[in-house]
Amino acid sequence: MKHRDIRKVIIDALESAIGTDAIYFDGRPAVLEEGDFPAVAVYLTDAEYTGEELDADTWQAILHIEVFLEAQVPDSELDDWMETRVYPVLAEVPGLESLITTMVQQGYDYQRDDDMALWSSADLKYSITYDM
């Protein structure tokens, strides 16, 4: 399946660059525990058929690369993770060019665990298009 392949090549590239300093998730984790940090999740949302060309099977989705750290870390530590470890890897992901057509940065959001106060995250987002 194309979605699984997209996530896999990105996780492989991140794991190759970052190493075992992080736990990697194929999809957004439903639960994180104290020993799970730092964590990096790669997932897709809003995947839909574009309908731009007749007889084409072109899709678009939002690709998320979300870094999770302990709740008490400042946003600057999340920025450091994104800017020095994650973002540079995404400039050239081996094998990704054969899976997607375009990849455009959308920005990123900060989030906090409001329920358990265990984690904080930075969610880097890209708009991607691809043929199924």
From Swiss-Prot:
Disulfide-bonded cysteines? none
Q: For this entry, list what GO says about its biological process.
A: symbiont genome ejection through host cell envelope, long flexible tail mechanism; viral tail assembly
Keyword Ion transport tagged: no
Q: Where is the signal peptide?
A: none
Assigned keywords, A-Z: Host cytoplasm, Late protein, Viral genome ejection through host cell envelope, Viral long flexible tail ejection system, Viral penetration into host cytoplasm, Viral release from host cell, Viral tail assembly, Viral tail protein, Virion, Virus entry into host cell
Q: Where does the protein principally reside?
A: virion
GO cellular component terms, A-Z: host cell cytoplasm; virus tail
Concerning SUPFAM superfamilies, the annotation shows:
Phage tail protein-like
* Cellular localisation: Virion; Host cytoplasm
The answer to whether UniProt assigns keyword Repeat to this entry is no
Q: Which family does the record claim for this protein?
A: Belongs to the lambda-like tail terminator protein family.
Quaternary structure, per UniProt, is: Homohexamer. May bind to major tail protein and /or tape measure protein.
> So what does this one do?
Plays an essential role in tail assembly by capping the rapidly polymerizing tail once it has reached its requisite length and serving as the interaction surface for the completion protein.
The identity of this protein, by name, is Tail tube terminator protein
